[in-house]
Amino acid sequence: MMMKLLFLIALFGCVVNSIRINNDNGLSFQSNCLGGSIQIAESIPLALNLQSNLSTHDAWMELITNAKKSIDMGIFYMTLTDGGQLDPVYGGQLGLDIYKALVDANSRGVSIRIVQNQPSSSMPDTDTQNLAKLGVQVRSINWPSLVGAGILHTKVIVVDQVSAYLGSANLDWRSLAQVKELGVLFQNCPSMVSDTEIAFQQYWDAAVVTELPSDWGVQYQAAYNQTNMASLLLNGNEKFEMFLAVSPPQFVSTDRTGDIDALVSAMNGATKTICISVMDYIPASLYNSPNTFWPVMDNALRAAAYNRGVQVRMLISHWNHTNYAIPQWLHSLDQVNNIDVRWFVVPDFPNEPQVPFTRVNHAKYMVTDEQSYVGTSNWSEDYYTNTGGLSYNIYNDEFTSQLQSIFDRDWNSPYSFPVTTY
């Protein structure tokens, strides 16, 4: 009860401190984000000839080195240090930088909490064990025992309840140096970040129970959702509207929008264009037994293209671990008028040996003519019905234009190939 009371005080303290300013359209924008910013952060694999404005490494360093009170991390796993065993040309130092920044933050009295998916032999917890020995609070969540299947797949970092990262990058040196990633860096925006903190708190609390609550209660109630978005002033005086969405349904608390609902709504709201960049796309489950057809996303895309004439472009990853069932569905979509599907292929690293499970576009985002969607989930049924994930759903013309430019850069790059290639 005391923990819940303190959490409510922290949450509603942020809301009370939020002054609102009316604009000419009658919308009310929260001034507690004045001086705040939102940026796109990318990881461009070494030896890939693409340019980005802000790297994931630099975004994380900015967050961690400037933390004053707290760092809360909801993650799949952490392997930041094992790249240090390789030749420096592979980029392992980037992970060591982040690990050292966490150690330094802990040393200067910053409270660090990490909740991770239950470790396994393939996903060891060496780094988090070592951090725990230094006093970092670490919890592991046995996801299948709570949900029935799936994993905690989220990648979110919340700092001082005012700044955050959310995106595709795992806490892994490979995600900084050898895998293509995309996420969002929020700075100095208490209202939206405190709402993101609620999702972290759900993971943190779920790690110490044997059964999920049927009703998450008022302390986990969302501040914003699809019908009541946060209205923010960011990047100077730019007006943003946005909300956080959550999967799976078992973690959708009161007033929270489900992730698949947010995704399909964005597709349904597009009037001109839908551009998708994601590692896996399949209108079915991938990890169930048996796997089953799940056309929720597919129907929305086909309806957008066929019924409304929306131009749909899909950039899907092809790599050593592409599931054999995926290409047939993409070939089918590519036959629909107004839908164009291409593969994105990251070439092997110039040096040998190759690092396993790298050299892939791991991003999970969509940009339409109306909005941006930046998430942590691959696009198959499993990720939305039994796997832990989050997304930021963002309405702002300039941000959407920037994300569109990134998509167009990749679409027109030498790493993009017709879907008929595979």
Curated annotation (Swiss-Prot):
> What residues does the PLD phosphodiesterase domain cover?
148-175, 357-383
- Keywords assigned: Glycoprotein, Hydrolase, Lipid degradation, Lipid metabolism, Repeat, Signal
Please give the superkingdom of this protein's source.
Eukaryota
Q: What Pfam family does this protein match (any one)? A: PLDc
InterPro entries found in the cross-reference section: Diverse_PLD-related (IPR050874), PLDc_3 (IPR032803), PLipase_D/transphosphatidylase (IPR001736)
Q: Does the keyword Glycoprotein apply?
A: yes
- Family matches, as PANTHER family: GM01519P-RELATED, PHOSPHOLIPASE D - RELATED
- What family does this belong to? Belongs to the phospholipase D family.
Q: Indicate what this protein is called per its UniProt record.
A: Phospholipase D Z
Designated gene of the protein: pldZ
